[in-house]
Amino acid sequence: MAITRWLFSTNHKDIGTLYLVFGAWAGLVGTALSLLIRAELSQPGTLLGDDQIYNVIVTAHAFIMIFFMVMPIMIGGFGNWLVPLMIGAPDMAFPRMNNMSFWLLPPSFLLLLASSGVEAGAGTGWTVYPPLAGNLAHAGASVDLTIFSLHLAGISSILGAINFITTTINMKPPAMSQYQTPLFVWSVLITAVLLLLSLPVLAAGITMLLTDRNLNTTFFDPAGGGDPVLYQHLFWFFGHPEVYILILPGFGMISHIVTYYSGKKEPFGYMGMVWAMMSIGLLGFIVWAHHMFTVDLNVDTRAYFTSATMIIAIPTGVKVFSWLATMHGGTIKWDAPMLWALGFIFLFTVGGLTGIVLANSSLDIMLHDTYYVVAHFHYVLSMGAVFAIMGGFIHWFPLFTGYTLHETWAKIHFGVMFAGVNLTFFPQHFLGLSAMPRRYSDYPDAYTLWNTVSSIGSLISLVAVIMMMFIIWEAFAAKREVTTYELTSTMLEWLQGCPTPYHTLKTSLVQINHQMIKS
């Protein structure tokens, strides 16, 4: 019965599929909002109305893309599908909690959409800084609904994190050490630890904001002895690990894709890759104030946060060069997932370089809240996280469905998307260097050219999104079934066949000669 299968499912594959479908749907909503933003900015003058409406759209775009697209797809979708298969577990450690983790997301999404629909909407930016988010500048229920939405999404992620940590540590076969698990499993494990440690701090911050708004507390109100900068510290102590949460599972997927399409049986520098991810996870917690260089931190604090931020480039560089070394000497198979992986490596590196620029507190004073920052984080998210999702989706699509995507169209789709996102975000570096500020719906005429170019790029990206929907439809319509897969000895998830049976590995695994086989 469909209702019992999809509503009450405790099967990691079904829940993973639910996450993927939900994330894809939310991604379309987020994409629609981004196109509204670029339509508004395509020429000087107003399109949508006042800046409140514009900022509500910007805020909703950010929340949807982060909490309802990237995280559900990467952690909920790929994580649920692949982690149990890769470690040879029959399912997740807590299958019913897994179900609850998913079903907290649709109500959370509904609350976020409601927040945009009632009163004037939450036009605070995704950071929700007071006093703008206080009950004077944002009277009404909008910000409160946003806070409740974040609470639900946060609970969902914390439960999911507990589940992934328990699963990866406890549900491996006895013969498999933690250092024999695939890199994607490591990336999800580290991501889960980051979620578990950072989300409670966000919950504390937004709960204090909630009481400031409704119960007359003054945590963030100087009139009662509070400090709005405290909120920024609490938010960014979550917010910076969050951006690593968004990219780490992508690192794991890229490692698998690069290894597979280079014809290698393992990635270059496995232990280096693991330690690099652990270093990134740790360092991600001690650099948060680089988002706050303009709030009058003292010079020693600025010097520390500048240096600590730059240190993150080292483990990141280890990963980039290990991916390149994995390809070295291999027989490269130029399939679509490999194109996405190569695009990821190049564009993520570009985004990382602009990040090094922004890490300098002196430069950041001038660049903070300009389009240079927007360009930076869209290079690592819109071209990092999203490219990893696309590559992973195409690579594992046969595993999920038993069908293969149309290879030529998948490559054309990559080309269109690559052109679109670069045309959208590269010019934004120029706008930022010319001091165009973020979060404004209009701008002086001098900025017209690059804004128009950027908006044309967003339309090309839209064409790519529509192409992807068509390519997926085509695969299900044509029903090209998978015939054979190589490298199953080191790619454990493929061992069950394509598509994977509903229940896998009810018997335990034993390890013989580095090959996992059914006992």
From Swiss-Prot:
Listed InterPro entries: Cyt_c_oxase-like_su1_dom (IPR023616), Cyt_c_oxase-like_su1_sf (IPR036927), Cyt_C_Oxase_1 (IPR000883), Cyt_c_Oxase_su1_BS (IPR023615), Cyt_c_oxase_su1_dom (IPR033944)
- Localisation: Mitochondrion inner membrane
**Any GO CC annotation of this UniProt entry:** mitochondrial inner membrane
Output one GO MF annotation. Answer: heme binding
What Pfam families does the database record attribute to this sequence? COX1
> In its UniProt record, which GO terms are filed under biological process?
aerobic respiration; electron transport coupled proton transport; mitochondrial electron transport, cytochrome c to oxygen; respiratory electron transport chain
PROSITE patterns per the record? COX1 (PS50855), COX1_CUB (PS00077)
Major localization listed first in the record, in broad terms: mitochondrion
Q: What is its EC number?
A: 7.1.1.9
Task: Give residues annotated as binding Na(+).
Answer: 40, 45, 441
Q: This protein is called what?
A: Cytochrome c oxidase subunit 1
Q: Which species is the source of this protein?
A: Xenopus laevis (African clawed frog)
The gene it comes from is mt-co1
